[in-house]
Amino acid sequence: MPEAGSTNLNDISMTPKQYAYYSLNDVKQYKCLVFLYGKESAWNPKAINGSHAGIPQGRSKWLITATPIHQVEWGLRYIKHRYDTPCKARDHWLLHKWH
């Protein structure tokens, strides 16, 4: 986890799940994201399904070469833009099996 006073997340060693938890700072939203990415990619940064790639299974070729942390950052921005929260994205996934 981050050291006290650290501000640059690129200098911190953490797993994608730890990074997501740190970024969201909300247990409920984190649990929704864990469910969502568990279904989409099993948190596998090398997962590819058709034109979708990475942990968030985004439709961006950039995700194929992005680090796992950058994939999570990308996914969180996508969720914020499209659904507002990971729980709303999860609810959409439960209805449609995609997000």
Label every model-predicted segment.
Residues 1-8:
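Membrane-proximal envelope biogenesis segments
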Residues 8-99:
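Peptidoglycan cell-wall recognition and remodeling modules
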